[in-house]
Amino acid sequence: MSYLPRLDGVHHLKLPVTDLDRSLAWYRSRFGYEIDIEFVERGVPMGYALAHPSGGPVLALRLDPDRARAAAGFDYFAIGVPDKQAIEDLAAHLTTLGDSHAGVHEATIGWILPGLHDPDGHEIRFYTTQPLPPR
């Protein structure tokens, strides 16, 4: 390839949802996301861009019930957390809120917390950005 485009990370993640208010409340209470931008079409809220206080990935929620139902169950992305302690703390927080998940496991290059599902059934995974120690 003679031309290599300059890329600069992931701009945002977008999920289709069936109920904006329910999804907003869930992402706020689980992870601390807050509204950065509200997308209004013909006077109707159709989506939100959510920001995280620690600078985690921007998450966009888009009202699109048909796509939300079709996408349920798939893990589109993994959100990074700094280290094993942070992912264990997150798992404990989710458990306290009554959320089902698969627990923290050692994975190929770090620690993973899979099996968490948002109100529309999207699997939200977390992976440590700190790799496992060398063996």
Task: State where each predicted segment sits.
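Conserved N-terminal glycine/acidic-rich loop preference
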Residues: 1-7, 14, 46-48, 61
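Vicinal oxygen chelate
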Residues: 1-6, 9-18, 38, 48-49, 68-135
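Core segments of cupin and vicinal oxygen chelate
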Residues: 16-58
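Short amphipathic beta-strand starts and helix->beta connectors
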Residues: 59-64, 99
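Acetyl-CoA-dependent GNAT
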Residues: 62-67, 128-131
